[in-house]
């Protein structure tokens, strides 16, 4: 098993995103938005994960810094499952819908400034349609119930105590 960090490392505390790769599967753990300023926000523009197979996404909790780049996966054509506890997925749905609305509104405001400065206009990071596409992929799994997250990857949520629905992921060898 190989684990790679895409976000929330190297001085960044937002943008939580890890790739777990085995011989059989490739899974993201969280897919969070970078927040904090122009430098941090610029990190949201590149692809969230290389254009390789992605079998599933596991969410540890619903905060934006753990879920906020999920709609980018929809823009990239991802249609696989996104697992989380029921409360995590409820929170993620609220946050992603609000974030999509804010992405569009903020982009419109920034594009007015760009237009006045003679700069090229940008698309919003994602739209409400992108958020809805990703929300259709959410798959709730309760605490303590073993599930097959991807080929060869079993998981169990345990209560992390961070917020309602937050979970640590156990990958037992004998589920």
Feature locations, PLM:
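Catalytic core of the metallo-beta-lactamase
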Residues: 2, 6, 16-22, 141-175
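Pre-active-site segment of Zn-dependent metallo-hydrolases
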Residues: 11-13, 22-80, 84-91, 95-138
């Amino acid at each position: 098993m190989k684990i790679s960090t895409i976000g929330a490392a190297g001085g960044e505390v937002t943008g939580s995103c890890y790739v777990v790769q085995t011989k059989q599967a490739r899974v993201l753990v969280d897919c969070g938005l970078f927040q904090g300023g122009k430098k941090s926000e610029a990190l949201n523009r590149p692809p969230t994960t290389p254009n390789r197979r992605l079998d599933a996404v596991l969410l540890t909790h619903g905060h934006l810094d753990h879920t906020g780049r999920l709609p980018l996966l929809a823009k990239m054509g991802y249609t696989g499952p996104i697992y989380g506890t029921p409360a995590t997925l409820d929170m993620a749905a609220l946050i992603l819908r609000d974030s999509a609305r804010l992405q569009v509104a903020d982009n419109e405001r920034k594009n007015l400034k760009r237009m006045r400065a003679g700069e090229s206009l940008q698309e919003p990071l994602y739209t409400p349609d992108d958020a809805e596409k990703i929300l259709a992929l959410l798959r709730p799994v309760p605490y303590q119930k073993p599930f097959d997250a991807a080929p060869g990857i079993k998981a169990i949520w345990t209560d992390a105590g961070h917020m309602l629905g937050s979970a640590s992921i156990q990958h037992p060898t004998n589920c």
